[in-house]
C-alpha cells in the first residue's frame, strides 16, 4: 500500500491551530497543485463534533474561495481536527493562514443560517447534520488561540 504523508506526521509534535504545507505536486503539463493541512484543534486532545465541522466545511468552501485564488477543495479530516485544502498554484502558509483566519472570523461574527450553502436534501448528502451554533463557537475558540503559519512552533499571524 502507498505511504500517505499525513500518517507519517508525528501528531504529538504539532501545535494547533496551524497551517502546514503538506506537498506541492507538478503535473505533466507543469500545473502545480498544493495540499495544505489546516489543523484547527490539537490532535488526540479534542475533535470538532460532526455537525459543527460539517457546517464549517460548507462555509469554508465559499469563504476560502473569496479569499484565496485557485481553491479546488477543502475537505475535513476523518479525525475531525481540521481540513485538507487543495489549491492550484503555490501559496505561502502565511497567505493561507490569513485566508483561514478571515474565514473563521466571518463564521464567528458575520454568518447567519441563510448564508450557509447546501443545507437541504437536494444539495447535501447529510443535510440534517449541521450546527451553525457549534461552527460559530468552535471558530471563536480557534481564533482565541491564534492561527500559526508553522506546525511545530507557534508563529501566530
UniProtKB/Swiss-Prot annotation:
Its cofactor is Fe cation. Gene3D superfamilies: S-ribosylhomocysteinase (LuxS). InterPro entries: LuxS_sf, Metalloenz_LuxS/M16, S-ribosylhomocysteinase. It holds the Pfam family LuxS. One of its GO terms (molecular function) is iron ion binding. It is an enzyme of class 4 (lyase). It comes from the Bacteria. Its EC number is 4.4.1.21. The keyword Cell inner membrane does not apply. Fe cation binds at residues 54, 58, 124. Keywords: Autoinducer synthesis, Iron, Lyase, Metal-binding, Quorum sensing. It catalyses: S-(5-deoxy-D-ribos-5-yl)-L-homocysteine = (S)-4,5-dihydroxypentane-2,3-dione + L-homocysteine. Binds 1 Fe cation per subunit. GO terms for biological process: quorum sensing. Belongs to the LuxS family. Involved in the synthesis of autoinducer 2 (AI-2) which is secreted by bacteria and is used to communicate both the cell density and the metabolic potential of the environment. The regulation of gene expression in response to changes in cell density is called quorum sensing. Catalyzes the transformation of S-ribosylhomocysteine (RHC) to homocysteine (HC) and 4,5-dihydroxy-2,3-pentadione (DPD). Homodimer. NCBIfam families: PRK02260.2-4, PRK02260.3-1. This is S-ribosylhomocysteine lyase 2. It comes from Lactobacillus delbrueckii subsp. bulgaricus (strain ATCC BAA-365 / Lb-18). The gene is luxS2.
